[in-house]
């Protein structure tokens, strides 16, 4: 499977958290996802993932929020970025 990098972002927050997002365009969907993107996005502090979005093979599109996993409906790369930023902002507001 050939992949082309669409975007990559990584930042360290003042409190030491790491925010990272990577999206690739793939030639074939990552089953069971039906779109042509492979992605991973995570917000972690001290190595503990608090927020994550990805489409791991066999699991499809899903997100992680403080250890719980739920389905995620992928609409577009732009919407993924908005949803990820909103989830990170909500998590950072808790601390």
Region annotations inferred by a language model:
Residues 68-95:
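Short, compact, well-ordered microdomains
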């Amino acid at each position: 499977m050939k992949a082309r990098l669409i975007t990559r972002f990584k930042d360290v927050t003042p409190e030491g958290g790491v925010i990272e997002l990577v999206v690739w365009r793939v030639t074939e969907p990552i089953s069971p996802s039906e779109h042509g993107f492979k992605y991973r996005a995570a917000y972690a502090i001290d190595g503990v993932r608090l927020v994550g979005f990805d489409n791991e093979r066999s699991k499809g599109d899903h997100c992680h929020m403080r250890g719980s996993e739920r389905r995620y409906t992928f609409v577009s790369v732009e919407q993924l970025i908005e949803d990820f930023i909103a989830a990170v902002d909500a998590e950072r507001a808790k601390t």
